[in-house]
Amino acid sequence: MSSFPWLTILVVLPIFAGSLIFFLPHRGNKIVRWYTMSICLLEFLLMTYAFCYHFQLEDPLIQLKEDSKWIDVFNFHWRLGIDGLSLGSILLTGFMTTLATLAAWPVTRNSRLFYFLMLAMYSGQIGLFSSRDLLLFFIMWELELIPVYLLLSMWGGKRRLYSATKFILYTAGGSIFFLIGVLGMGLYGSNEPRLDLERLINQSYPATLEILFYFGFLIAYAVKLPIIPLHTWLPDTHGEAHYSTCMLLAGILLKMGAYGLIRINMELLPHAHYLFSPWLVIIGAMQIIYAASTSLGQRNFKKRIAYSSVSHMGFIIIGIGSITNIGLNGAILQILSHGFIGATLFFLAGTACDRMRLVYLEELGGVSIPMPKIFTMFSSFSMASLALPGMSGFVAELVVFFGLITSPKFLLMPKMLITFVMAIGMILTPIYLLSMLRQMFYGYKLFHVPNENFEDSGPRELFLLICIFLPVIGIGIYPDFVLSLSVDRVEALLSNYYPK
């Protein structure tokens, strides 16, 4: 076990190096872009090295532990550590943030502040996934709000201020319940705050209090995931945000809610989770159907993709609620799979919108003729999103299906009903995605704009798309590569904390 503070370096490096952006010489945006890209690549290489040489996959315990006193008055510690549940999310964060930085290449207005905010988000996300202290977890959760709000309000569409305000109100409202839960758990049974996750795992609570804690945390996660009916900020936000910001929102930010649900609610509040799990499964099934049906009625293709994200989050909720090894591993696989696919669909939608200056499907048609590369990649990732066999979306949804079917928690008839509802959702998914492709790319040329405006994808964009397409295919063909990260930790979590 290495005593070197790898995780502290990974958390602090992006925001510290990002603050130096403002001291770079004023010689255009090129220096700022390459500096930011270098920081992202260095961070990603460091985390890859640390995990390859200092992390044992077969060990289900917390590794790379760090514990230092931070604020002595409150007995507040800087506690970090990772296990199989957080490893995949951290690697996804490093990979997607690096590519989102590459996607943000065209941003020229206030580019120093833009790239600094992206790096600040990077630090917050790595900090959240590696946090082993409840208050530190909350601080990292909140650290996301300011960068995202500024990225939305300064580099968005016409209704960017409305979307940014809606986002901050929803997430800040959920955070109030989160903070109450953190303080309640930390101060329960003691005058001194006890916020170490290792100690809180063994803490027992009265049934009513545990349910209240669980529900408070669930509201905060329901906003970020999102879970209906707290999802309405998402379509507005994705409809207005710059596509590089959308990549971080869809690829990482939504997954923070799912990670919190597993790390806090499942691990620390097992009895309440056992009671709530049937409701999670029911809500997840309803969400798949509702969001897929709503997506079909969207005229704005960015909002259609946003509702498809809400629908796919339903599979994660069902996997978490199934309380099985297979189901929870399927949920983690879906977190990574949708992180790749959802982020790329928003990138493609954003680049297409920048070229066409049109977002309404009835105004489009025949776009495949001037932009064949965008058409090819849009079609490929749409196939991945609708769970085409051989791609990561298919494997993730199939594993969640098996997790629900094999769950001893549910009787046969409820299982059959929920499986039937999920199947209907899987039928609706190709309907809204293929109809979007047909309206955008096929048919006659409905818009009246000169061809010069419609340049196809350049080398930078194609490189980015291929970088994401390779893991989507790789996970679809050999999912054990990802499942091996979490399978031992999931087994330990479920065997230790759940009634048989």
Swiss-Prot record:
Subcellular location, principal: plastid
Major enzyme class: translocase
Pfam families reported in the protein's UniProt record: Proton_antipo_M (PF00361)
Cellular component GO terms, alphabetical: chloroplast thylakoid membrane; plastid
The enzyme's E.C. designation: 7.1.1.-
InterPro entries: NADH_Q_OxRdtase_chain4, NADH_Q_OxRdtase_chainM/4, NADH_UbQ_OxRdtase, ND/Mrp_TM
Domain of life of the native organism: Eukaryota
Compartments where located: Plastid, Chloroplast thylakoid membrane
Keywords: Chloroplast, Membrane, NAD, NADP, Plastid, Plastoquinone, Quinone, Thylakoid, Translocase, Transmembrane, Transmembrane helix
MF (Gene Ontology): NADH dehydrogenase (ubiquinone) activity; ubiquinone binding
TM spans (from-to): 4-24, 37-57, 87-107, 113-130, 134-154, 167-187, 211-231, 242-262, 272-292, 313-333, 334-354, 386-406, 417-437, 462-482
Catalyzed chemical reaction(s): a plastoquinone + NADH + (n+1) H(+)(in) = a plastoquinol + NAD(+) + n H(+)(out); a plastoquinone + NADPH + (n+1) H(+)(in) = a plastoquinol + NADP(+) + n H(+)(out)
Membrane topology summary: Multi-pass membrane protein
A Gene Ontology BP annotation from the UniProt entry: electron transport coupled proton transport
Family under the similarity heading: Belongs to the complex I subunit 4 family.
Name the record gives this protein: NAD(P)H-quinone oxidoreductase chain 4, chloroplastic
Organism: Oryza sativa subsp. japonica
Gene encoding the protein: ndhD
